[in-house]
Curated annotation (Swiss-Prot):
A motif (Effector region) lies at residues 54-61. This is Ras-related protein RabT2. CDD domains: Rab (cd00154). The gene is rabT2. InterPro entries: P-loop_NTPase, Rab, Small_GTP-bd, Small_GTPase. GTP binds at residues 32-39, 80-84, 140-143. It comes from Dictyostelium discoideum (Social amoeba). It is found in: Cell membrane. One of its GO terms (molecular function) is GTP binding. The modification Cysteine methyl ester is found at C215. PROSITE patterns: RAB. Keywords: Cell membrane, GTP-binding, Lipoprotein, Membrane, Methylation, Nucleotide-binding, Prenylation. One of its GO terms (cellular component) is plasma membrane.
């Protein structure tokens, strides 16, 4: 059974830009145990909607405009890597080029909290820039107040022990605290100067050059 809910959104005005203008791309990877609600959190943040009973399969991502910071235009690419056991072996490629990570656990599931260390180890072992990675941790499903197993104080102490500066309990279902951890993560990444410059003009030129070479061979 599927239930769909929506909440009020706040619209941010994005400056008019040409499609060929350069921009800075920030790549964020969402990690956590299966059924912690990564897809639901991403859906709530990006589309402002919630659909009960929908699980992400494999890897999915969204790209959204962020805006201008210090004269540079930023776009955010957020990857939802499904971490069911059968997918863990294929996620290494998605760590490459990641500027930040959002780790999720289920507030009602102690094991998902215990496994946060596994996901931190994955970042250390698979991300080339792990020594300077930006990480936030969120506990999803805080709306299930009678079923919560992890005390927020315990979560905060864990974050402090790992030098992770941001922790937040959220609810994708009830749209509680969804935007704040994303904004904190993006701002910390930008402050560190971590992003990839994308030049659509250069990409287009390379594509055309490659096509011309192929035509000359024929």
């Amino acid at each position: 059974m599927k239930e769909k809910t929506t909440a009020t959104t706040t619209t941010t005005t994005i400056p008019t830009r040409n499609a060929d203008d350069d921009y800075e791309l920030i790549k964020v990877l969402m990690l956590g145990d299966y059924k912690t609600g990564k897809g639901s959190v991403l859906r709530r943040y990006h589309y402002n909607e919630f659909e009960l009973g929908v699980s992400s399969i494999g890897v999915d991502f969204v790209i959204r405009d962020y805006g201008i910071v210090n004269g540079k235009y930023y776009k955010i690419q957020i990857w939802d890597a499904n971490s069911c056991e059968r997918f863990r072996s294929i996620t290494q490629a998605y760590y490459r080029g990641a500027h930040g990570f959002m780790l999720l656990y289920d507030c009602t599931n102690q094991e998902s909290f215990n496994n946060l260390q596994f996901w931190i180890n994955e970042i250390i072992n698979k991300s080339p820039n792990s020594n300077n990675s930006t990480i936030v941790i969120i506990g999803n499903k805080c709306d299930l107040v009678n079923d919560i197993k992890i005390d927020p104080i315990k979560s905060k102490l864990f974050c402090d022990s790992k030098s992770i500066t941001s922790f937040q309990n959220v609810s994708a279902k009830d749209s509680i605290n969804i935007n704040e951890p994303f904004e904190i993560l993006f701002k910390q990444i930008i402050e560190k100067g971590h992003s990839q410059t994308i030049s659509p003009k250069l990409i287009k030129q390379r594509y055309e050059n490659n096509n011309n070479k192929s035509c000359n061979i024929l």
